[in-house]
Amino acid sequence: VLFRSRRLHFYIGLFIGPFIFVAALTGTLYVATPQLENWLYHDALHGLAEGTPQPLSAQIAVAEEATQGNLRLLAVRPAPALGETTRIMFADPGLGESESRAIFVDPIALRVKGDMTVYGTSGILPLRQWIDYAHRSLLLGDSGRLYSELAASWMWVAALGGIALWAMTRPKRRLNNALQNHRRLHVTLGWGLLVGMLLFSATGLTWSQWAGGNVDKMRAAFGW
């Protein structure tokens, strides 16, 4: 039984390992997204820092001219500060769900600074959306989302199972050999990551496609 439990713990770790790595990497990138976007889309996001901004109607007219007037105006996100551009979004039937074409206009110079596909009415930029897709589905569509959900479902089993194995097999005497040192390092990392893995599993399932829907139904049933 102990041997099978160890094998199961090993295979679960092997299964969820890629998910943990990608989720940690994309999560870190997501935190740094504002700085990355400012560097990658600098020209589109910034305009003249001195002068008088022109009316929104004039900025929209410039954007409509860039689209040749063939697209329906969807949303406008005015420049939040001097030196930044206005984001004007148009509905484009050739794009995916919740996607729109954004024209970035310098409100002072009335010049188009960028033209790209964005997401949502707030105009989420492509980099942030790519990181979000990678975090949710590993860029593999529904198959990736299913794998992510399965990995999150088994993560708490791996974490608590590892603690149970440690409790059942910890040596009575402290031995200083390579095997015990390796095992001690593994146990130390396991204890250190235990709370994080449990929270990661719970929050991951809450936001997942299938389990998340069931969580929403449960919350509605209990009035949470």
Q: Which functions belong to the PLM regions below?
A:
Residues 1-224:
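Conserved histidines in hydrophobic membrane contexts and catalytic metal-binding motifs
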